[in-house]
């Protein structure tokens, strides 16, 4: 099963398997019709009749929906009746063209069914009316989920973009400088590759306590990073702060990092607890996974997040499990150290013979002193 690199339970976007299955079904039906030995014009006649009935049914359904939307023209469509018509008959051009083509073939081919057109139209209207009244054509939950993901209608999509634009995009660019200032006054407490990043915890059950020590006694608050302030939405000097925690292993300090929960998960949890939101526990889990995946996609294309942020996604264990949040975080910190070590090892590998055979080229800087790795000195 395809999944995100963050956690095995986070799904990837849906693919084209439904279309592939439809293609297989199409091939099987064509073989079955060929095996039955019916004349091609007979098969085409009934196929056209069925397609015309489907498109006519969609047209009738759209007209019924339009009757409701016309009552909301000013509040939903800014007084434009044409926009209301387009909202109800969005694919009317395609359906209309197919309907005209079907009617042409229906009239030109012999009427083997010998059914009056008026009778079929009345029967179609009766069938569609029953479908609307009884809700027989409702979308399956998987279809609703696919539409929401494709059109970015999910709660998770809005939360992820809000979290990035309203928070991460503001604090991540200045995070290395704040860590450097902190180290100057605290004897380089934040050392190593993992210590120079913001680590964001993502419990998929959305259980976010306000005190990390409650989640795991081996996670202890140490200090706060120097504050960052910015003018936001009319608030002068809005303050952003981040906390530094030490991670204990066998009673000894095993790691130090900038750590916090993803605060939008609290929103998802609160929505699932409030009946007015109509948000079930299953919805919460699905939206939490989509939130992680969407934020991962956003950060992958955000230059300010490069090497400044790491997402730690985990599934809250069942009762009696030996899961330890501090060990999960330490595992990520150690993995980051290994990644840096492997990267430095690869860059120091002896070059091939083709490279050694080239003339050496000296790259000499005109500056007296080497520049630091920070980009804000320019």
UniProtKB/Swiss-Prot annotation:
Q: Where is this motif: pLxIS motif?
A: 362-365
Annotated 3',3'-c-di-GMP binding lies at: 162, 167, 238-241, 263
User: What's its catalytic activity?
Assistant: H(+)(in) = H(+)(out)
Segments in the Lumenal topological domain: 35-44, 107-116
Q: Which terms in the Gene Ontology molecular function aspect does this entry carry? A: 2',3'-cyclic GMP-AMP binding; cyclic-di-GMP binding; protein homodimerization activity; proton channel activity; signaling adaptor activity
GO BP annotations, alphabetical order: activation of innate immune response; autophagosome assembly; cGAS/STING signaling pathway; defense response to virus; innate immune response; positive regulation of interferon-beta production; positive regulation of macroautophagy; positive regulation of type I interferon production
Q: Where is this region: C-terminal tail (CTT)?
A: 339-378
The protein's job, in short, is:
Facilitator of innate immune signaling that acts as a sensor of cytosolic DNA from bacteria and viruses and promotes the production of type I interferon (IFN-alpha and IFN-beta). Innate immune response is triggered in response to non-CpG double-stranded DNA from viruses and bacteria delivered to the cytoplasm. Acts by binding cyclic dinucleotides: recognizes and binds cyclic di-GMP (c-di-GMP), a second messenger produced by bacteria, cyclic UMP-AMP (2',3'-cUAMP), and cyclic GMP-AMP (cGAMP), a messenger produced by CGAS in response to DNA virus in the cytosol.
- The identity of this protein, by name, is Stimulator of interferon genes protein
Species this chain originates from = Bos taurus
Biological classification of the source: Eukaryota, Metazoa, Chordata, Craniata, Vertebrata
Name the gene for this chain. Answer: STING1
């Amino acid at each position: 099963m395809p999944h995100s690199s963050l956690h095995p339970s986070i799904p990837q976007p849906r693919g084209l398997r439904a279309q592939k299955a439809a293609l297989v079904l199409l091939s099987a039906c064509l073989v079955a019709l060929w095996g039955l030995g019916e004349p091609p014009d007979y098969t085409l006649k009934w196929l056209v009749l069925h397609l015309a009935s489907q498109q006519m049914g969609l047209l009738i359904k759209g007209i019924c929906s339009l009757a409701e939307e016309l009552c909301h023209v000013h509040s939903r469509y800014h007084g434009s009746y044409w926009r209301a018509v387009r909202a109800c008959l969005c694919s009317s051009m395609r359906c209309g063209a197919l309907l005209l083509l079907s009617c042409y073939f229906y009239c030109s081919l012999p009427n083997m069914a010998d059914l009056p057109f008026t009778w079929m139209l009345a029967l179609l209207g009766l069938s569609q009316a029953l479908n609307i009244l009884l809700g027989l054509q409702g979308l399956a939950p998987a279809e609703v989920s696919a539409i929401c993901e494709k059109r970015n209608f999910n709660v998770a999509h809005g939360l992820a973009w809000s979290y990035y634009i309203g928070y991460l995009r503001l604090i991540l660019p200045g995070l290395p400088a704040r860590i450097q200032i902190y180290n100057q006054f605290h004897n380089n407490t934040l050392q190593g590759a993992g210590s120079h990043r913001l680590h964001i915890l993502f419990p998929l059950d959305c259980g976010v306590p306000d005190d990390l020590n409650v989640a795991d006694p081996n996670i202890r608050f140490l200090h706060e990073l120097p504050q960052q302030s910015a003018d936001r939405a009319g608030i002068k000097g809005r303050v952003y702060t981040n906390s530094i925690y030490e991670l204990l292993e066998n009673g000894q300090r095993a790691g130090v990092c900038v750590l916090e929960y993803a605060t939008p998960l609290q929103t998802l949890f609160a929505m699932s607890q409030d009946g007015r939101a109509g948000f079930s526990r299953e919805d919460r889990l699905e939206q939490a996974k989509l939130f992680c995946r969407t934020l991962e996609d956003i950060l992958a294309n955000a230059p300010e997040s490069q090497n400044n942020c790491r997402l730690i996604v985990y599934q809250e264990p069942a009762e009696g499990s030996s899961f330890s949040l501090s060990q999960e975080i330490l595992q990520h910190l150690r993995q980051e150290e290994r990644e840096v070590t492997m990267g430095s090892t690869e860059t120091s590998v002896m070059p091939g013979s083709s490279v050694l055979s080239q003339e050496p080229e000296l790259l000499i800087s005109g500056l007296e002193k080497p520049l630091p790795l920070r980009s804000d000195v320019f």
